From Swiss-Prot:
GO terms for molecular function: ABC-type oligopeptide transporter activity; ATP binding; ATP hydrolysis activity. This is ABC multidrug transporter atrC. The chain crosses the membrane at residues 55-75, 99-119, 178-198, 203-223, 282-302, 320-340, 705-725, 745-765, 824-844, 846-866, 931-951, 955-975. Pleiotropic ABC efflux transporter involved in the protection of the cells against a wide range of toxic compounds. It is a multi-pass membrane protein. Disulfide bonds: none annotated. GO terms for biological process: oligopeptide export from mitochondrion. It comes from Emericella nidulans (Aspergillus nidulans). Glycans are attached at residues 385, 401, 488, 632, 800, 995, 1122. The lineage of its organism: Eukaryota, Fungi, Dikarya, Ascomycota, Pezizomycotina. Residues 1-24 are annotated as: Disordered.
Length: 1284
């Protein structure tokens, strides 16, 4: 695979307004910066417990750092012991005894480091978990408190992903890294103070090293933090766009939008990549400057020390050696400043982004306690001279000086064209917005003076597009009890009220038939229920609290005629004694209203009762005539004597209690179900994961080569240092000019070593960021692309909610960025240093080298690998748990209108927090286990240094090795220990990166069932007709024991217009899903033009099909963008190409499609016309407007097969009439085959064949006239909808 991120140009401003899906609101407040202040503020979210844990941890870290400094004292004694033996002061036996005693101090020091390292790492990590939990809690609370207008700007689309991914960045920068930093600083300060007391002049020279290092690090980190902030902002916009794509995945599949949408998603990533490239020279400068300064300072200290010794200012060589060794140990700890500063700046940038929303004051805060809460509600509603424009379109007046009185206890109906302001009134009554001018009163009180939560609890709403939440049916209806006296009642009492409400909404019967009844889980957004079932549950949710004011915004639009009749009666009954405002396009549902208000362009055209308006013969009467259905006996005159059409056969309905598939079929269904389960996937180990990442982008081979060469050069640092320090000891055996000359030479060698570090680390820092940014870009794009490749059943799985998927899109590529950035280079350098130091030790003293290398390094590596394995398992578990919390946040934010109308912000926040608490509490034990392994990696180095010191001195005393060889070997062991200790400090980044790689690799190889293959590549759908279904049975893959279709036989001829009608949940929309190949039949077959559908190339097939869904899906971008996505271009390029067929669609084609969908007038009236942003999910448009745009998108495709799933359900009567004529014309256009699902029977009465579904089968078939005469189910449906 090749990435073209490098070659893509950023779209111009003009292009971005027409083709780039943009977030309409700025994501960053003016002047906002990620600074040290933002980092400090992270810790203000720590409670008393967290502060105590952190204080104890920092004390332990400082003690651990002081323990590091104690090494120097032991080494000072070590030099004394060596000197005494060399000078003959002590005997070989005394020498061995003294060495053994000193070796024990190393053992004790290692034990202390084990305890202290375990303590501070465990406490800091746990405290960070809790602090991040508090920040996430505050962030979602702030998000849920924002007024709806905030989300209209598209500002909240990626809130769930930000909470998860930014939380992980904060976690990384506010946990164990703090302990390591304090440990390093404590070591440096302790060493400096101890040496300052003894040799203050030389020590003061050495202090220039940290001053220069810290100064350089601070400046570079500050600049780098600004770039990190900008990248996070761009990624937040990209996540928002991706969230919209994944939420509308069925539309993406149906229209083959994947490559076009991924290409638009990539435009954000290209911009982020450009900013990311600017970090490369900064990291090169940061790492190279750090190591160069350290070795230059080291050389200066050695040079000055030699000359001070020559002048007699320093008494013994041991004093110089001790100071130099202090510099070395302190410098090793200072080298951690650079990588940690990057972690801290990323945490600050991530926190600053979250704090911006946390600090934002909502104009309408649902958490506020202020406002009136009257004890009694009558229900008098009055709108007085209300004028309103949406904040996103202030130039368009939606309501113009509008006045209306809604008497208490009466039913008032609002009708009119889409966009006339009907739903706007609902939004104002719910206080989603405040009017521009005028007043709205409830029982004489201005609603702006009422408590927001109290108002929404007493004014209940059923929306046009009902939104349900993950959980059970009971959970969803119970949300309506929040804030009422029954909220804390027993489950039995709540269940009683829930069932009463369900019966009222005609939902009890179908709920009782579900697998687990009221405890049945319904999936994300209620996806496992049909549209009509969802709407009935939503009605039950709104009436369960017995509100005094009820708002019904197309509350029965998704119900079948029979259910609609019964539910309407129930609503009529529910309306008794309460104020009800009904918005309806189905006029049959409002004919009994006390007052019907006909609206147009924000004004009232006429109002009155059904009878008075009919008598007036005005606008309303004309609408009634359009919707009227003929059900009289004269229809019999047009019926064939046989009672059947030429291709129509009446099927006998036979009910079967449970469908039992053969064992082989059930086995296949279960294998398909398990195939999408990531937990069953075999995971790659670290080396395999790294190899996969390297192979994935071969275009980075030169960058990898630079990193390899840089690492090879960098690994020479410790061996070179060991040799030079050993030579330093020899220098002190000389005197006079010879000593000074040798001293000057070795000081210059240290400068050469510094120059080598400058070159190597500059290359490593620059190249690793280049690789990391490229891989992050590539995998963000690839993971979205691979998700969109999957079958619909992949998105049906509980773990694959939209929020969880977006979280993975954001967090997994970032984990790879951390793994393949400087972290992996430091790990490689540390590994090479351990190897080279080990080889050096063996080369100079093979006995000592073999004993120490094979006695110390294997247990250290073993402990580190065990930590990585445990850490990896912990990361997978926490990611899964945070995925659940992310799903809760995502569905709440995306359904903010439903959440606010139910006033369940606190309930949602409590659910979210409970998931966070569960994630934190379940992480304690595995975290404690992994920290034991970390403690071992920090202490084992002391134990094999003790072994090396004891055994080396023994060899020296026995004359088996020279003093110089011993020094080289021992210092090599010492530096190998230092390198190995650093090796596993990055294990958290390693494990996260490995887990991310495993998921991405699994997803990439996961092949959908419905896909193009070499076998079907050339197999097209032919003419697209006839379509034949032979004994089709179907169960959803995740519910194999709940059959939906139970043996459907049907033939649809070329040019026919066929309609599916029936009760909600009877299988109509499932038939549409089968014809779109969202799913394949469990048994039976579907043939297209005599070819089995499963044998046809799905891309070729879908290219001749267009779908209009019941709940239209629009994407971020302009109206033009959304319609253009419907165009099929046979030359569409793969997603990594620069070419985009969508941009080639002409404005004339767009206009033609809009006119056909009766949408041109309203679109052309907008200030930006077809270039008007649709908003996230089409939020800038009304429901009817969204549906017309979706119809235009389907018609511009010029399909051979047109699938209409309640295509006109959200349209007003006039628009429906015009659009219906357009759709009928489209259906009659040539040989086009049209399949329509409809509850509004007036839209399908002219169909060639009407199929009445019942119980998963076709109960009746025929024309409108034939079925009316037959007097069966269809006739009863028509009678229910007749208006005359």
């Amino acid at each position: 695979m090749k990435s073209t991120a490098e070659s893509k140009e950023t779209p111009s401003q003009d292009e971005s307004t027409t083709s780039v899906p943009c977030t309409e609101a700025p994501l960053v407040e003016e002047g906002e910066e990620a600074s040290f202040g933002a980092y400090k503020r992270i810790f203000t979210f720590a409670g008393r417990t967290e502060l105590i844990l952190q204080a104890v941890a920092i004390l332990a870290a400082c003690a651990s750092g002081a323990g590091i400094a104690l090494q120097n004292l032991i080494f000072g004694q070590f030099v004394t012991v060596i000197t005494d033996f060399t000078n003959g002061i002590s005997t070989p036996a005394d020498f061995r005894d003294n060495a053994a005693e000193l070796a024990l101090y190393f053992v004790y020091l290692g034990i202390a480091r084990l305890v202290l390292s375990y303590t501070y790492n465990t406490l800091l990590t746990y405290a960070a978990y809790r602090i991040v939990r508090n920040i996430r809690h505050a962030y979602l609370k702030a998000a849920l408190s924002q007024e709806v207008a905030y989300y209209d700007f598209g500002s909240g689309g990626s809130i769930a992903a930000q909470a998860t991914s930014n939380g992980k960045l904060i976690q990384a920068g506010a946990s164990d890294k703090i302990g390591l930093l304090f440990q390093g600083l404590a070591a440096f300060v302790t060493l400096s103070l101890s040496r300052l007391w003894c040799k203050w002049k030389l020590t003061l020279i050495c202090i220039c090293i940290p001053v220069a290092t810290i100064g350089t690090t601070g400046v570079v980190a500050a600049v780098e933090a600004g770039h990190e902030t900008r990248i996070l902002q761009i990624h937040a916009q990209a996540n928002s766009f991706a969230e919209g794509i994944l939420a509308g995945v069925k539309a993406v599949h149906a229209f083959g939008m994947r490559d076009s949408l991924v290409r638009k998603f990539d435009e954000y990533l290209v911009e982020a990549h450009k900013v990311g490239k600017k970090i490369s020279p900064l990291l090169g400068l940061l790492f190279s400057a750090e190591y160069t300064i350290i070795y230059l300072g080291y050389g200066l200290a050695f040079w000055q020390g030699i000359h001070m010794f020559g002048r007699g200012e320093i008494g013994t060589a041991g004093d110089i050696f001790t100071v130099l060794l202090s510099v070395v140990i302190a410098s090793i700890n200072l080298t951690l400043l650079a990588p940690y500063s990057i972690e801290f700046s990323r945490a600050a940038s991530a926190a600053a982004q979250l704090f911006r929303l946390i600090d934002r004051e909502s104009e309408i805060n649902p958490y506020g306690k202020e406002g009136l809460e009257p004890e009694r509600v009558l229900g008098d509603v009055e709108l007085e001279n209300v004028t309103f424009s949406y904040p996103t379109r202030p130039g368009i007046t939606v309501l113009d000086n509008f006045s209306l009185k809604v008497p208490a206890g009466k039913v008032t109906a609002l009708v009119g064209q889409s966009g006339s302001g009907k739903s706007t009134i609902v939004g104002l009554l719910e206080r989603w917005y405040n009017p521009t001018s005028g007043a709205i009163r409830l029982d004489g009180n201005l609603i702006s003076e009422l408590n927001v939560g109290w108002l929404r609890r007493n004014v209940r709403l059923v929306q046009q597009e009902p939104v349900l939440f993950q959980g059970s049916v009971f959970d969803n209806i119970r949300y309506g009890l929040v804030g009422t006296p029954w909220e804390n009642a027993s489950r039995e009492e709540q269940m009683e009220r829930v069932q009463e409400a369900a019966k009222l909404a005609y939902a009890h019967e179908f709920i009782s038939e579900l697998t687990d009844g009221y405890d049945t889980l319904i999936g994300e957004r209620g996806g496992l229920l049909s549209g009509g079932q969802k709407q009935r549950v939503a009605i039950a949710r709104s009436v369960v609290s017995q509100p005094k004011v009820l708002l019904l915004d197309e509350a029965t639009s998704a119900l079948d005629p029979h259910a609609e009749t019964i539910v309407q009666k129930a609503l009529d009954k529910a309306a008794e004694g309460r104020t009800t405002i009904v918005i309806a396009h189905k006029l049959a549902t409002i004919r009994k209203a006390d007052n019907i208000v006909v609206m147009s362009k924000g004004h009232i055209v006429e109002q009155g009762t059904h009878e008075s308006l009919i008598a007036k013969d005005g606008v309303y009467a004309g609408l009634v005539k359009i919707q009227n259905l003929a059900v009289n006996a004269s229809a019999h005159d047009n019926v064939n004597e046989e009672g059947e059409g030429e291709d129509v056969a009446l099927l006998e309905v036979t009910e079967t209690a449970v469908t039992r598939y053969p064992t082989s079929i059930r086995g296949r269904m279960n294998s398909i179900k398990d195939r999408d389960d990531y937990e069953n996937h075999k995971h790659m180990d670290m080396l395999a994961a790294l190899a996969y990442l390297v192979r994935e982008c071969p275009e980075l081979k030169w960058a990898y080569l630079v990193v390899l060469l840089g690492c090879l050069g960098g690994c020479a640092m410790y061996p070179g240092q060991a040799i030079l320090m050993s030579r330093v000891v020899e220098v002190f055996t000389l005197s006079g000019d010879a000593m000074l000359d040798k001293g000057d030479f070795y000081a210059s060698m240290l400068i050469v070593l510094a120059a080598g570090c400058l070159i190597c680390y500059l290359a490593v820092g620059y190249a690793t960021n280049t690789i990391a940014q490229h891989l992050s870009h590539w995998f963000r794009r690839l993971i979205l692309h691979d998700m969109l490749r999957q079958d619909i059943q992949f998105f049906d799985r509980e773990e694959n909610t939209t929020g969880a998927l977006v979280s993975r899109i954001d967090s997994y590529p970032h984990a790879i960025l951390e793994l393949m950035g400087y972290n992996i280079a430091l790990v490689v350098i540390a590994v090479l240093q351990v190897v080279t130091c080990g080889i050096l030790a063996i080369a100079f003293s093979w006995k000592l080298g073999l004993v120490v290398v094979f006695g110390g390094i294997p247990p250290l590596v073993g402990a580190g690998m065990v930590r990585i394995r445990v850490d990896s398992r912990l990361d997978r578990q926490t990611s899964k748990k945070y995925g659940t919390s992310s799903s809760i946040a995502s569905e709440a934010v995306n359904a903010i209108r439903t959440v606010s109308s139910l006033a369940i912000e606190e309930t949602v926040l409590r659910r979210y927090t409970e998931e966070l608490d569960h994630a934190v509490s379940s992480s304690v034990k595995p975290m404690a286990a992994t920290m034991i392994c970390f403690g071992l990696t920090q202490c084992i180095e002391y134990w094999f240094q003790a072994l090396g010191f004891w055994y080396g001195c023994r060899l020296v005393s026995l004359g088996e090795t020279s003093m110089y060889s011993f020094f080289v070997a021992f210092l090599s062991v010492f530096f190998a220990g230092q390198a190995s200790a650093q090796l596993f400090q990055w294990s958290t980044s390693i494990t996260k990166g490995i887990n991310a790689t495993n998921y991405i690799a699994w997803l990439h190889q996961l092949q959908p069932t419905v896909r193009e293959t070499p076998e079907n590549h050339d197999k097209g759908p032919g003419s697209g007709a006839p379509i034949a279904m032979d004994n089709v049975r179907f169960s959803y893959p995740l519910r194999p024991d709940a059959p939906i279709l139970k043996g459907v036989n049907l033939k649809i001829n070329k040019g026919q217009f066929i309609a599916f009608v029936g009760s909600s949940g009877c299988g109509k929309s499932t038939m549409i899903a089968m014809l779109e190949r969202f799913y394949d039949p469990t048994t039976g077959s579907i043939t297209i033009d005599a070819s089995t559908l499963t044998d046809i190339n799905p891309i070729s097939y879908r290219n001749i099909v267009a779908l209009v869904q019941q709940e239209p899906t629009l994407f971020q971008g302009t109206i033009r963008d959304n319609i253009s996505l419907g165009v099929f271009n046979p030359n569409t390029q793969p997603f990594f190409s620069d070419k985009d067929a969508v941009k080639s669609v002409s404005d004339e084609q767009i206009e033609s499609a809009l006119r056909a969908a009766n949408a041109w007038d309203f679109v052309s009236s907008l200030p930006q016309g077809i270039y008007t942003p649709a908003g996230s999910g089409g939020s800038q448009l009304s429901g009817g407007q969204r549906q017309r745009i979706a119809i235009a998108r389907a018609l511009i495709r010029d399909p051979k097969i047109l699938l209409l799933d309640e295509a006109t359900s959200a349209l007003d009567t006039e628009s429906e009439k015009i659009v219906q004529k357009a759709l009928e014309g489209a259906a009659r256009d040539g040989d086009r085959l049209t399949v329509a699902v409809a509850h509004r029977l007036s839209t399908i009465k002219d169909a060639n064949v009407i199929c009445v579904f019942f119980g998963g089968k076709i109960a009746e078939m025929g024309t409108h006239q034939e079925l009316i005469v037959r007097g069966g189910l269809y006739r009863r449906m028509c009678e229910a909808q007749a208006l005359d």
